[in-house]
């Protein structure tokens, strides 16, 4: 996969998560988890773009580590949404798969 393809995928991932969070029923739980999910999911693409501009191999590795952490954190928040009954598993299935692929 090329850099540009991965940039597109991470951007699409962020946009899909934004749509998911906007569609959640309003409650204190979804507000808190939704905010955390938005932060981590949008950070995946932002940090990948930063990694592409890294000035050294060490900088690239460091930023890619952040990308991995944020993708994994996004999975955690989506799993919590399902486990807490805030959204059905089917609603996040594709997003979880994409986050897992981005981690690979």
Identify the residue ranges that each predicted region occupies.
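Amphipathic alpha-helical assembly/interaction segments
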Residues: 1-104
């Amino acid at each position: 996969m090329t850099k540009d393809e991965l940039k597109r995928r991470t951007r699409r991932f962020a946009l899909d998560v934004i749509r998911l969070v906007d569609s959640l029923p309003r409650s204190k739980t979804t507000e808190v988890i939704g905010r955390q999910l938005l932060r981590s999911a949008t950070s995946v693409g932002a940090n990948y773009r930063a990694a592409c501009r890294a000035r050294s191999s060490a900088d690239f590795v460091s930023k890619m580590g952040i990308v991995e952490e944020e993708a994994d954190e996004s999975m955690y928040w989506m799993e919590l949404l399902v486990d807490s009954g805030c959204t059905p598993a089917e609603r996040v299935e594709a997003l979880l798969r994409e986050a897992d692929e981005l981690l690979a």
